[in-house]
Amino acid sequence: MDRETKLRGLMGLCVRARQATFGEDGCLKSIRGGGCAVLLLDSGASKATQDKYRGVCDNAGVQTALLPRGLLQDATGRSGVAMAVAPGGLAEQIRQNLPVEGKEEHGQQMKSENHGGGASVE
């Protein structure tokens, strides 16, 4: 099973297990309050939105990952540009399955950045 397929399954499981937060206010509150281990961003989000989330994540020490456009919605069934994953086993499994920065998967580049919020993705 490739990383993207496994990541899709884990993201869906997070939603069903209520370990995911969506929406700008919910995600930002989760990040600032320490309830976010990793933030997944859709590459379809505007540069300003991506920069806003990354700035908040930098300050809070939360890892961010940029996913191919549409992957977040396909995997979770929810529209939106960001998903905050609560700390725990599912977050760790998602971290382990995030693509290595700069590695191409299925013709789309997926990037992960570690902002001091946990294990480095290598």
Residues covered by each model-derived region:
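Hydrophobic alpha-helical segments that drive targeting, anchoring, or assembly
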Residues: 17-22, 46, 77, 88-90
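Catalytic cores of RNA-modifying enzymes
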Residues: 1-5, 9-10, 15, 92, ...
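N-terminal first-folded block
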Residues: 3-41
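N-terminal positively charged helical leader segments and presequences
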Residues: 32-54, 59-63
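Mid-chain, well-packed structural core segment of small domains
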Residues: 54-80
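Short, ordered loop/turn segments at secondary-structure junctions
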Residues: 25, 44-45, 69-71, 88
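C-terminal structural segments of small proteins and small subunits
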Residues: 71-111, 120
